[in-house]
């Protein structure tokens, strides 16, 4: 009987020691936003006021080999939004896995236009048609930067096939400029998939940043392709105040759909924690 007790205590102690190797900090942050939105007289607006809140739990820990583990879990309006676990290997790159679309690949760079607020199509309550988003369920990502060139890729095995994408970004070809191009495949059904492509360019000088981005989604169904053209310019008035103007135009190949044009101004002011 005494031997059994000793064995049990030894096993418990061993498990406790092993768990401390992955201990790290856990931080909680949140945001709260109140928005007023007005639309043209030809559209039904309802209540123009709305609010949104987010809570994010983030943790990190260092491994014995110098690598770092990062974890994030986000709730939006009290509902699960995204989660991600990432292994930062330094110069070798970052491997990530989670239920979030913007961790790597074409979804992370679906809208690269500078803005003081949200994307112009989001601020005016337009659709995200033409935005190259693969979705984020159980996605494996990898991203590495070397000599000013960043390679970002994503892979997700779904029931009907494989969602995958790759993006290449160049930040040092021209001083102040950034260029990127990416492509991906989104499986829709056993006989249908979307081929996506996006390309963008941004240039910054002093407090001004301007950009343009072209995206296309080639659908399997005939006459169903979607093209998006976006451009914006932002100006940092000072450390607290920024303003921007952007446009987003969506063209549908299907004649029964009406092309969508969005434009808008955004402004943000930071004061302390607000």
Segments predicted by a language model, with ranges:
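Outer-membrane beta-barrel proteins
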Residues: 1-274
């Amino acid at each position: 009987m005494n031997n059994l007790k000793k064995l049990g205590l030894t096993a418990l102690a061993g498990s406790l020691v092993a768990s401390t190797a992955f201990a790290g900090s856990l931080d909680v942050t949140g945001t709260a936003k109140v928005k007023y939105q007005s639309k043209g007289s030809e559209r039904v607006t309802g209540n123009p006021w709305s609010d949104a809140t987010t809570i994010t739990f983030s943790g990190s820990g260092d491994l014995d080999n110098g690598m770092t583990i990062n974890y994030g879990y986000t709730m939006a309006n009290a509902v699960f939004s995204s989660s991600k676990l990432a292994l930062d290997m330094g110069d070798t790159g970052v491997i990530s896995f989670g239920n979030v679309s913007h961790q790597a690949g074409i979804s992370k760079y679906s809208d690269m236009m500078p803005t003081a607020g949200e994307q112009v199509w989001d601020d005016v309550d337009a659709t995200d048609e033409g935005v190259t988003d693969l979705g984020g369920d159980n996605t494996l990502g990898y991203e590495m930067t070397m000599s000013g060139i960043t390679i970002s890729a994503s892979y997700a095995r779904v029931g009907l096939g494989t969602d995958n994408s790759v993006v290449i970004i160049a930040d040092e070809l021209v001083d102040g400029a950034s260029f990127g191009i990416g492509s991906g495949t989104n499986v829709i059904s056993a006989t249908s998939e979307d081929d996506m492509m996006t390309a963008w360019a941004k240039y910054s000088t002093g407090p001004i940043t301007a950009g343009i981005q072209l995206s296309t989604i080639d659908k399997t169904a005939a006459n169903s392709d979607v093209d998006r053209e976006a451009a914006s310019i932002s100006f940092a008035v000072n450390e607290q105040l920024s303003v921007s103007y952007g446009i987003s135009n969506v063209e549908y190949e299907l004649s029964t759909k009406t092309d969508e044009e969005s434009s808008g101004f955004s402004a943000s002011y930071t004061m302390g924690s607000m």
